[in-house]
Amino acid sequence: MANDITTTAAWQSLTERYEAFQGTTLRELFQDGGRAEKLSFDAAGLRVDLSKNLLDDAILTDLVALAEQAGLTDRIEAMFRGEHINNTEDRAVLHTALRLPVEESLEVDGQDVAADVHEVLGRMRDFATALRSGAWLGYTGRTIKKVVNIGIGGSDLGPAMATKALRAYATAGITAEFVSNVDPADMVSVLEDLDAESTLFVIASKTFTTQETLANANAAKNWLIEQLGSEEAVSKHFVAVSTNAEKVTAFGINPENMFGFWDWVGGRYSVDSAVGLSLMAVIGPRDFMRFLGGFRAMDEHFRYTDFGQNVPVLMALLSVWYTDFFGAETHAVLPYSEDLSRFAAYLQQLTMESNGKSVRRDGSPVTTGTGEIYWGEPGTNGQHAFFQLIHQGTRLIPADFIGFARPKQDLPAGEKSMHDLLMSNFFAQTKVLAFGKTAEEIAAEGVDDNLINHKVMPGNRPTTTILAEELTPAVLGALIALYEHIVFVQGVIWDINSFDQWGVELGKQQASDLAPAVSGEVEVDSGDSSTDALIRWYRTNR
């Protein structure tokens, strides 16, 4: 039986402090004029202000003690050393090795994984350079102007998010589209705007057997052959991110144009592996290496900084505090940047696929809450959609606000700047969420008595503010690594395996089992009357 975190002295102390903290307000806590300075930290190009969170010095001390009593130091080192911390699959967890500098080595299971990483990176760099320079030509001799990434889950969400986030760095005239859904509308909507002669497809599937990805890949292949009139065109317009050379070759892709990655990289942690090939094609090798540098800077902060100053550790501990003591179930991520409009969707897989678990590493039931629901939209759009619930609803929703000092583009707003207007909203929201507005303050403004309670803003809504000078490749890498490490720390505290995803597997198996009945090849007999009736209705109305 695993050690139970709820039996530790730190957890017991936090339980008592939670009770004593009830009724404490952020207004009271900010009577300490040094609070913002004490609870603001710099990490890998990010400025992180934790001062608008619901904690005092004693709670912070206990949270740090909780991390220590959970054995976090040893678990961090075990991950970075390549120990098999993914115990249910007996694998190392080494996404951090994807951004090791070329001069370092890391031997795991008798293999220098750093050398392997840089061998693939070198091939990616050569390929992206050929593509961007025009040395790589399509079947008819045209240069490539459009890259279409076909993948799903981690083979889609990461590169799609990052390519949009770093659109300002797309300087070679190559743009990217992303197809993930097996719904044919996804593929059709992309194909209808493509010029086959100048399009390259990147098929991202480690095993080259992923059902949705292969369905889309074959649809793209058939379209290309129809457009260009020859199966020989496939090798000039398709490359693979995979390790299955046999299936890649059978598809028609030259195995020399196959870029591999390893079983110690989970899909949701793979954007900085060969899965990022489409991103490298768009932004170029130099900026892709800067992207990796941002990851590495956050890795070093996480590995070597004391827990009391360690941003991923502190943010993870706060999430445990809200989940297990305040009963919070969701966590909002609110980037005030349209370029980060896909960041919350990316984090949904990273966080919920990792920590959506109900048993501990030894298979025993958890004794805590686990796995917050992550969600969000860019500001200021969210302000006109769901902020009402965060401000005045009955649910506690911790939120991360992400903003930048300098935009990549700006426009005037009268005599002012649109970016300044955006950030004025950013700062106003965290202020109002923290401090609210009392009935007395509203009454002093002459508001009708019957409206006062409707206008009261209770405040005490916790937020974390994350700022950077601008959204660069390095900053994006640091931001992604920040949340990767938050997920890891949460998993250590809850004693769950953050690196498997057994909950995804059964649904895929059932879909394969039901496919013949859904397509009408066999009689419907799913084993339950509801599913049978639904499939029959579908077949009748097909």
Curated annotation (Swiss-Prot):
Keywords: Cytoplasm, Gluconeogenesis, Glycolysis, Isomerase. The active site is at residues 353, 384, 508. It is an enzyme of class 5 (isomerase). GO terms for biological process: gluconeogenesis; glucose 6-phosphate metabolic process; glycolytic process. It comes from Corynebacterium efficiens (strain DSM 44549 / YS-314 / AJ 12310 / JCM 11189 / NBRC 100395). This is Glucose-6-phosphate isomerase. One of its GO terms (cellular component) is cytosol. Pathway: Carbohydrate biosynthesis; gluconeogenesis; Carbohydrate degradation; glycolysis; D-glyceraldehyde 3-phosphate and glycerone phosphate from D-glucose: step 2/4. Catalyzes the reversible isomerization of glucose-6-phosphate to fructose-6-phosphate. It comes from the Bacteria. It catalyses: alpha-D-glucose 6-phosphate = beta-D-fructose 6-phosphate. Belongs to the GPI family. The keyword Ligase does not apply.
